[in-house]
Amino acid sequence: MNFFFIFLFFLTINFSLSTKVISKESWLLDKNLSSIEFELPVLFANNVQGKFEEINGIIEIDLANKENNKAIFSVKINSINMNYKKYKNLLLSDIFFNSYNFPVALVDTKKFSYKNENEFSLEVELTIKGKTEIVPLDIEIIHLANELIQIKTDLDFSRTLFNIGTGKWKSTAILKDKGVIKTNLFLFKQE
């Protein structure tokens, strides 16, 4: 009789551990297919546009109750390619992104609810230059295959809120305040 209870105990432990492992799935960013770009409007000139070459990201989906989902994406600031190449050093300097002291910018969803929608919005934490602000993020999810999804997002941010542009560059008369970050992300399900 004791043996039966011990066996049942270990069987229950094993089942609960395997359920916890199965109840979460991870999706990893394909860095070669994905892109994260930004744009800052400029009065009477071409907008400042850039693309980050070094990006990372992961999404964890809570399959059990769909409430504790998490996603985090980051860019290495000095990996930017931009249309105003002669101003790249200025953009990386302490006047704008200060990439020496703040080499990474990131978006963190914390916990969010997801119930297989194709489009939805979240409030996320955007961290630039060591400053974190809550901003809205519009998300479109395209299921390409069982193990591959595409995520497109639009995120508006205030450059002055993050001190992007100091001194004579703080003015929003020429270089406007509202910036946009657009992503086209491809993620593969982790086995």
List the predicted regions and their residue ranges.
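Sec-dependent N-terminal signal peptides
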Residues: F4-I13
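Low-complexity, acidic/polar, glycine-enriched regions of mature
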Residues: L17-E191
